[in-house]
Amino acid sequence: MSTWLLPENIADVLPSEARKIEELRRRLLDRFRSYGYEMVMPPLLEYLESLLTSGGADLRLRTFKLVDQLSGRTLGLRADITPQVARIDAHLLNRQGVTRLCYAGHVMHTRPRGLHATREQIQIGAEIYGHAGLEADLEIQQLMLDALHLAGLSRIRLDLCHAGVLAALLARDAQAAARGEALYDALSGKDVPLLHELTDDLGADTRAALRALPHLYGDASVLDEARARLPVLPEITRALDDLAQLAASAKGVEVAVDLADLRGYAYHSGAMFTAYIDGVPNAIARGGRYDHVGQAYGRARPATGFSLDLRELARISPVEARGTAILAPWAQDDALSAAVAALRDAGEVVIQALPGHDHVLDEFACDRSLVERAGAWVVEPR
């Protein structure tokens, strides 16, 4: 076996890709900061039970596990940063009001999410804690769309769903609630025959409502159909009202509603929003409300947020990260050194050509040169 081979679905990030990823990371974190989000940096490694407080069986399967040589306890390499941020909010910050936090860091997955997906993602996201109202969801949705526009993406489609609809239907029917996981699988997979089989012996109202969910998809007008076909329950009315406001606030993007798109249902407690772009089959960003995320840490605060994979974003983003630079000669000259230092202090990239390598081009576009004219070092176009 060659010593330079990497594990499957693990890859090096080479200069051009790394530069683009870093450019996008800086843009997004700066935008998060402009909204008032504070950055946190949780550790890559934690005790397993701390990492698996939410997310269910899927998160457990995706988490790498190893034994701590100091304590003998089982550790996990994080597969999702969101639970870590919830821990920070609950125990380390322990604030009473609204807290806005953001992050960017590597996560590891035991299995890739798709055929060509990496098992080492760079997750970036933002979270609001402490406000149960829809205003927080509206802000997070706007920030997510803002981030995608900053990355140069267009023709964005925003898919909306709400965990409260299914939760309300199950809460009114104990028999349906006992089959909750199977119903969730059938709805998420749009498996109508299985759904009919699972609902045959349920009450008429619950049966009709559950069977209607796979057909309640389309543009925002489908919410009117949902009001007509679903039971008039306060939780369902509130969920549909929330989706209507989220749809109306999403300016400049295509909006779709799918009341059976319940991926992440076990994790979310309210509105869920997912962003897609043309030509990319998988979601590029996901977000939503998860008010119970801090419960395992003894402090279940209202919470909503979103995240995306920076490596995938860089792959599809048209943002050009190949920077321009100034080419300077290499010489032991105090005036040259002072000129180079001044340019770098001003934010310019200055590359000094090492002796014998003047003809070698790197990935920076050297569109200017630092040359000596009449005893002074000046920048000229190349």
Curated annotation (Swiss-Prot):
Amino-acid biosynthesis among keywords: yes
Pathway note: Amino-acid biosynthesis; L-histidine biosynthesis; L-histidine from 5-phospho-alpha-D-ribose 1-diphosphate: step 1/9
Subcellular location: Cytoplasm
One Gene Ontology term of the molecular function aspect: histidine-tRNA ligase activity
Pfam families attached to this UniProt entry: tRNA-synt_His (PF13393)
GO cellular component: cytoplasm
Keywords assigned: Amino-acid biosynthesis, Cytoplasm, Histidine biosynthesis
Function: Required for the first step of histidine biosynthesis. May allow the feedback regulation of ATP phosphoribosyltransferase activity by histidine.
PANTHER family: HISTIDINE--TRNA LIGASE, MITOCHONDRIAL-RELATED (PTHR43707:SF1), HISTIDYL-TRNA SYNTHETASE (PTHR43707)
Miscellaneous comment as given in the Swiss-Prot or TrEMBL entry: This function is generally fulfilled by the C-terminal part of HisG, which is missing in some bacteria such as this one.
Subunit-structure text: Heteromultimer composed of HisG and HisZ subunits.
Name recorded for this polypeptide: ATP phosphoribosyltransferase regulatory subunit
Gene: hisZ
